[in-house]
């Protein structure tokens, strides 16, 4: 089961980028298989997005192109955007005209061989367009993160 929280996890590398205008965290406990690494999680979410995520990104790119915002596939947008990493976490970030965001992919071991996978997002608005943009994106963001974790 995927759970939602609005706080950055304790000791997350993402904490150094706070404060933010928006924060969410989704997590899921997984067990009965090899541990997932942050790199594997990044690959699963961004390199092989769901058909829905791919379709929404194509629509987003069409809608934002007139505003001069960065466009491209999820994979293209996160390539070479790793801000920091540890053996259990990767933080990916991107700054555009309208907003700055970072996503943490945290894979924390738990007792009994299980693992807590947490995807945390923080957003900072660079200007009013960022706030308006994220108002429309937020429901889809929440849906897509939840679905990505449910597939694990």
Where would I find each of the regions flagged by the language model?
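Short C-terminal domain-edge/linker segments immediately following a structured domain
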Residues: 57-61, 121-125, 148-152
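Hydrophobic ligand-binding cavity/cleft-lining segments
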Residues: 1-67
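Intrinsic-disorder/low-complexity, polar/charged segments enriched in Ser/Thr/Lys/Arg/Asp/Glu/Gln
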Residues: 23-27, 89, 116-118
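A conserved amphipathic terminal alpha-helix motif
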Residues: 133-152
